[in-house]
Amino acid sequence: MAKNLDPANFQKIKVANAIAIGGMIGAGKSTLTRALGNKLNADVIFELNENDELQNILLKRLYEGDETSAIAFQVYFFCTRFENYRQGILNHKLSVFDRTIFEDRLFAHQNMTADPIMFGFYDAMWHDKTKELIYSIGVPKLYIILDLKWDEFKERIFKRGRNSEIENFSVNEPYFRSLHNVYVDYLVKTCQIYGINYLVLDSSLPTEKQVDIILDKIKSEKLFDGV
């Protein structure tokens, strides 16, 4: 999928004072986002808002196989994440983000394959906002990509105990496998296309070790002032 993201017609890419943490569902993004944000004294922007009632309803219906809700979920999540990212960057303080809109397109492609017309609409919207992000707002200065093995993914899903994921796991397993098979490669290619500095990390490493590896990269490459 990333090969379709052609920056040839784009202006010079802008780089924001931000770090993004990306990866498969259950990879430990939120945990690492929190730990890294605390270590860097940075603003932290999480993907999920547990108090967002609409988000929770759409997510539940998505895992129950409701195709209409899947479309609404993707659009709602995309718009919310874009605005959260924009607001975070406008604060001018170093920010750590739990996922970005670059990953939304992968989820939409997986969830909306049954409706190519709606995906075409979504894709056009995604590209318009992505152009705004890359040369008006700014891409993350560093993208951390968590690599999660399938068995570990399954174990974590059941361990964290979200009913919407567990109750419908057998039905959604083909979707999860398809997503898992392409996730890391998709993110790596996306970073390469847009010239985003990235680091692939083993999700099975202790969080403290992951943070140390990230800090070593930041310091050795002098990515952020004062770190």
Tell what function each PLM region has:
Residues 21:
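Hydrophobic anchor at the beta1->P-loop junction of P-loop NTPases
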